[in-house]
Design a protein with these regions (language model features):
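Glycine-rich phosphate/diphosphate-binding loops and the adjacent beta-loop-alpha structural elements
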Residues: 1-18
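C-terminal non-catalytic interaction/assembly regions of soluble proteins
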Residues: 19-146
Length: 146
């Protein structure tokens, strides 16, 4: 299936770190192997070097997730929790970020996909999962999905 959401606009969509909050509602709705599309400007980039490198420094999502989950709870680092949430989402589903304001390489470095438009993102999602059910969450950061 496909979930489409947003982070509610600026300042909540200013960077990828903040965007994870909106992705969480999509995670609650998407089936394993599905696609979450999130519209988020990310005009300020990733939101923190440490956060970025917790994903970008690994070959794949599974390796990054295992590494972060293996950290002793008494030794966790600042921003680790948000990277762990994003990695948990990426283990479950593909993520496509719709943004015209950020270098697409930032998203691909962090194991996500990029689209310039919602139409482009939908075409990408359909090429991954087919013509599946679409769930729309207009303001993903402001809902609790059950």
């Amino acid at each position: 299936d496909i979930v489409i959401t947003s982070n509610g606009g600026y300042p909540l969509d200013q960077n990828m770190y903040q965007t994870v909050k909106g992705l969480s509602s999509g995670e609650a709705c998407v089936n394993d192997g599905g696609v979450i599309i999130i519209a988020s400007s990310c005009v300020d980039g990733h939101g923190g070097e440490f956060f970025y490198h917790l994903l970008a420094d690994y070959e794949n999502v599974e390796e990054a997730y295992k590494n972060i989950c293996d950290v002793d709870p008494s030794k966790t680092e600042f921003d680790q929790w948000e990277a762990q949430v994003l990695l948990r989402i990426l283990v479950k589903a593909k993520v496509i970020v719709v943004s015209e304001d950020c270098d697409p390489k930032l998203f691909t470095d962090m194991h996500m996909m990029h689209a310039n438009t919602l139409s482009e993102a939908l075409n990408m999602a359909r090429s991954i999962v087919g013509n599946k059910k679409i769930t729309i969450i207009p303001d993903g950061i402001a809902v609790i999905v059950k």
